[in-house]
Amino acid sequence: MLHQMMKAKLHRATISAADLNYEGSLTIDTDLLKASGIRPYERIYVYNVNNGERFETYAIEGEAGSGAIQLNGAAARKGMIGDFLIIVTYALCSDDEVDEHRPNVVLLNPDNTIKEIVK
């Protein structure tokens, strides 16, 4: 049997920009992608803490060190600059893998710098 487990999480990312006319996705600072293990173009689940919106899209790389968390395209309607997001990916684990599985959790400061990495 396969179990869908949390693979990675960026906790309390702050929306830094939104571009309704961009062709979709969520731009994330490359440093945050690397710290969390989220890969470019990977499906991500996004939960807006401020308004309760929940949606899925894919991650694209933003400039390293920029703190970029930018809603693009239709996703730009799902939040406002300053809103807090929880960005999550999931992975399938077998019965043999599930007990040893540990997600990468990156806790963020309001300026999208890394506060703590929990593994």
Curated annotation (Swiss-Prot):
PTM summary: Is synthesized initially as an inactive proenzyme, which is activated by self-cleavage at a specific serine bond to produce a beta-subunit with a hydroxyl group at its C-terminus and an alpha-subunit with a pyruvoyl group at its N-terminus.
E.C. number: 4.1.1.11
Gene that encodes it: panD
Family: Belongs to the PanD family.
UniProt binding sites for substrate: 57, 73-75
Modified residues (Pyruvic acid (Ser)): 25
Name used for this protein in its record: Aspartate 1-decarboxylase
GO terms under cellular component: cytosol
Organism of this sequence: Desulfotalea psychrophila (strain LSv54 / DSM 12343)
